[in-house]
Amino acid sequence: MTGSFWLLLSLVAVTAAQSTTEEQAKTFLEKFNHEAEDLSYQSSLASWNYNTNITDENVQKMNEARAKWSAFYEEQSRMAKTYSLEEIQNLTLKRQLKALQHSGTSALSAEKSKRLNTILNKMSTIYSTGKVLDPNTQECLALEPGLDDIMENSRDYNRRLWAWEGWRAEVGKQLRPLYEEYVVLENEMARANNYEDYGDYWRGDYEVTGAGDYDYSRDQLMKDVERTFAEIKPLYEQLHAYVRAKLMHTYPSYISPTGCLPAHLLGDMWGRFWTNLYSLTVPFEHKPSIDVTEKMENQSWDAERIFKEAEKFFVSISLPYMTQGFWDNSMLTEPGDGRKVVCHPTAWDLGKGDFRIKMCTKVTMDDFLTAHHEMGHIQYDMAYAAQPYLLRNGANEGFHEAVGEIMSLSAATPHYLKALGLLAPDFHEDNETEINFLLKQALTIVGTLPFTYMLEKWRWMVFKGEIPKQQWMEKWWEMKREIVGVVEPLPHDETYCDPACLFHVAEDYSFIRYYTRTIYQFQFHEALCKTAKHEGALFKCDISNSTEAGQRLLQMLRLGKSEPWTLALENIVGIKTMDVKPLLNYFEPLFTWLKEQNRNSFVGWSTEWTPYSDQSIKVRISLKSALGENAYEWNDNEMYLFQSSVAYAMRKYFSEARNETVLFGEDNVWVSDKKPRISFKFFVTSPNNVSDIIPRTEVENAIRLSRDRINDVFQLDDNSLEFLGIQPTLGPPYEPPVTIWLIIFGVVMGVVVIGIVVLIFTGIRNRRKKNQASSEENPYGSVDLNKGENNSGFQNIDDVQTSL
């Protein structure tokens, strides 16, 4: 009895302690929510002001507001850690405390946190204000509008190449040193928060613990992404082969029938969405176009009309109207007052019921669908606004992105477009129009999945340290070729930072959300279509006007982050994992059609071919065999010297052979395919236009003209510095120079030796002359040797010298 009594008493004490801790935690969080609302709003408002008016003054105000918010959050995070999660039974309180106990950037020292903030601001500014000088017009073109127009509409291979390279040279090279520092600091922050690296920190958004069967790990996300990509890949390969065949008609001399696709030909600056390739790839051109851009222009649509129609869609499924503040404060078009702004479309939940969208809307079907996507974010924000501050977010980042995409799937259907008067009432759907529609959808949806998967995989590997910074670009394009089937149109060395030329990378966004959202959106779409009682093919489903579907979706949206995402997913679709079957079901008719179209085509891609292969010259260098122990190290400095030497040869050739002054520089000599045993390929572009590749024959002529000079620069000859395909000059092998002091010493010693020899021979000659003169009158002629007299006139010279 006594033991039981003490056990019962202990349980009562523990329960009382837990109850006290929970009450204290509840009071703490209520106070936090109230204070966080104000400070977070001021920080978000300052950020909005900067993004819609990029000035030094606004960046200063933004930094000050962020500093206040960070200091507050750091202190609150420290206080939250005093509450033991084991003593909290209320799951809502526990989730809030767990979120707040993550210190974020406040885990860094004040100095490093400030530096990271400075880096992020600089990267944002460089991206948002980057411009490229057009050599034809001498006009500086920004990304929007300007370069994006070229990448969306131009069919000029070289014009597209100029825009593609210009953006990466002007923006990417500036971002490179900042991004290197960014990786180090973000990794340090992540490890201070008990994550392996920053990629692991990002994957933490999907982690669910303490939820039993609904638990989900960060490692599981990686496995699910790999699994689903393997299932999607056959569809992508068929789409890739079809697009390649079509692009060969537009760019016949620039596409390999078995190779990768040049990155600058894929519809936008990054090759992320292939939507703009539709006009080049439409299967049945004689059918009415399902791209309603022209109809929108003819009917005088503007940005406000686009967003009003998007609002009507949401209202038709019983979701709320936008607030008046939304219409008053949003930036739906690019300002005409000269302000510099961040044009990339984004939805903003500033707090306190202040919801806004920032977008430089153009009257196109693509922006019509983007408006639905961004307004989907706002609907999600409004739905969970009643949740505590720390739970006002999507169930995971992919959910937030998927909501708007669900609406885009319906808004793109011919059924919905006819209802808006954007397709003729007599528009007839048949097999050909359906294939046209599905191909257009696939260019946007399927075409982007490998891009997204590969980009995030590269970043995860960078953060994990699996790709050293000395190989960032090499590995980036290696993975791009292997995974995406896309090749760089010009080789990029380690001065570039091509990934950071995308908004989401420069602005520090996790990117895997755009992969997971695509899987989720089709799972959601299939489930909501069933709720809407749709019958027939999934790709024909339009849930507009279905209040039942809207209410089912709204129930999930209101949860925010208060429940595990695995549970929220199960509530909608019936399972708690990512499943690609709905996506594959949606595109099944297209997949079948593509396989038939590609019957006689190569499906897949070789990674060996590049657009510049035909104009490249291979070089092999043998330092050891030529110089032995005196061989020097081949490094970046030597490569720079090589490029400069080729530039010199090009200048000389154009001057002497063509009577032209062309100022080639080392940056006009492009090097690729570098191997450790010192071999590489190179080609040359015009200094006036990077898209103008100098014909290989011209470069070969220039090399022949200056071959001896190039050999001398590297202390090599034609055998140890080989330009494959260029005949040897048959010039004499290189002879190393002699040191000057050795020459002087040799001359002096030679003079001394010659002087000594001259003196010796002069002495001998004089003696002989003297002896010859004496024999003409012999003073000893009277001496009679027979009588034993000594002839003193005849003595051996050696005897005379010895006696001396």
Swiss-Prot record:
Active site positions, chain numbering: 374, 504
Extract the signal peptide range. Answer: 1-17
- Residue ranges, Extracellular side: 18-739
Q: Which residues lie on this side of the membrane: Cytoplasmic?
A: 761-804
| Location of region: Disordered | 771-804
**Motif (Endocytic sorting signal) spans which residues?**
780-783
**SS bond list:** 343-360, 529-541
Annotated Gene3D superfamilies: 1.10.1370.30
Q: Which residues bind substrate?
A: 272, 344-345, 514
Q: Domain Collectrin-like spans what residues?
A: 613-804
Q: Which UniProt keywords apply?
A: Carboxypeptidase, Cell membrane, Cell projection, Chloride, Cytoplasm, Disulfide bond, Glycoprotein, Hydrolase, Isopeptide bond, Membrane, Metal-binding, Metalloprotease, Phosphoprotein, Protease, Secreted, Signal, Transmembrane, Transmembrane helix, Ubl conjugation, Zinc
Checking Pfam families in the record gives: Collectrin, Peptidase_M2
State if Cell inner membrane is listed as a keyword.
no
PANTHER family with a match to the protein in the record: ANGIOTENSIN-CONVERTING ENZYME, ANGIOTENSIN-CONVERTING ENZYME 2
Q: What name does UniProt use for this protein?
A: Angiotensin-converting enzyme 2
Organism of origin: Bos taurus (Bovine)
